[in-house]
Amino acid sequence: MSSSEAVTREYTINLHKRLYGTTFKDRAPKAVKQVKLFAQKIMGTKDVRIDNKLNKFLWSQGIKNVPHRVRVTLSRKRNEDENATEKLYTVASLVIVKSFKGLQTKKVADN
């Protein structure tokens, strides 16, 4: 599989291990940055866009009480803008789950 095709996958991100030891006032902003970093690493795109619902979920318990885990859908898409520097971008959106137990990475069928 090449990193130049559009694809959608579901991942669980353990934010607790990425934020452990972080100052309280930096936790929610760092969580957003860590989700972007995770998406860049996994999808191989520099341009990562966070969905509004995912951002609200990360900030839902305040600046210092970030959820331990978050389930996200990462969609790599083609950039329609002609003069864009990056040909592909990634959209990170929230997936609501009752429990994180037993979940694995899975490919989502494209629309």
Swiss-Prot record:
Superkingdom field = Eukaryota
Enumerate the SUPFAM superfamilies for this protein.
Answer: Ribosomal protein L31e
BP terms from Gene Ontology? cytoplasmic translation; translation
Q: Does the keyword Ribonucleoprotein apply?
A: yes
User: Which UniProt keywords are listed?
Assistant: Ribonucleoprotein, Ribosomal protein
Gene3D superfamilies tied to this protein: 3.10.440.10
Give the matching InterPro entries.
Answer: Ribosomal_eL31 (IPR000054), Ribosomal_eL31_CS (IPR020052), Ribosomal_eL31_dom_sf (IPR023621)
Give the CC-aspect GO terms.
cytosolic large ribosomal subunit
Q: Which family is this protein grouped under?
A: Belongs to the eukaryotic ribosomal protein eL31 family.
Instruction: Report what the protein is called.
Output: Large ribosomal subunit protein eL31
